[in-house]
């Protein structure tokens, strides 16, 4: 019989929020009796935007802004129905994007 697995990907701009959310998910899954692998830190996406500071000229004066997207991966192996119910009832911060694959 094939092992069932739930794969959870988390994305957030703040690494502290994503680590707290990952810790909550791991703790909830372990409490319900499932085996947990993770949280695994994935590469951070970094997008840089360059803007000219002046309105008309002075192209040499520029300002750079960056946006970092932190990602984590959690695998829950052999989840029980109790695990799925506990994960559905979990409240996580609004700054965390969650993608769940069964």
From Swiss-Prot:
PROSITE patterns membership: RIBOSOMAL_S10
A biological process from GO: translation
Keywords tagged on the record: Ribonucleoprotein, Ribosomal protein
Presence of keyword Phosphoprotein: no
Alphabetical list of Pfam families matching this protein: Ribosomal_S10 (PF00338)
Cellular component, GO, one term: ribosome
Gene Ontology molecular function: any one: tRNA binding
HAMAP family (alphabetical): Ribosomal_uS10
Function: Involved in the binding of tRNA to the ribosomes.
Oligomer status and interactors: Part of the 30S ribosomal subunit.
Family recorded in the similarity comment: Belongs to the universal ribosomal protein uS10 family.
Name of this protein: Small ribosomal subunit protein uS10
Organism classification: Bacteria, Bacillati, Bacillota, Bacilli, Bacillales
Primary gene name: rpsJ
């Amino acid at each position: 019989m094939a092992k069932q697995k739930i794969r959870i990907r988390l994305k957030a701009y703040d690494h502290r929020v994503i680590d707290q959310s990952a810790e909550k998910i791991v703790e909830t899954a372990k409490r319900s009796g499932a085996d947990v692998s993770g949280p695994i830190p994935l590469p951070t996406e970094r997008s840089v935007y360059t803007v000219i500071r002046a309105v008309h000229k002075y192209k040499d004066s520029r300002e750079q802004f960056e946006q970092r997207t932190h990602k984590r991966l959690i695998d829950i192996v052999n989840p029980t129905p109790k695990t799925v119910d506990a994960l559905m009832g979990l409240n996580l911060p609004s700054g965390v994007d969650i993608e769940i694959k069964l």
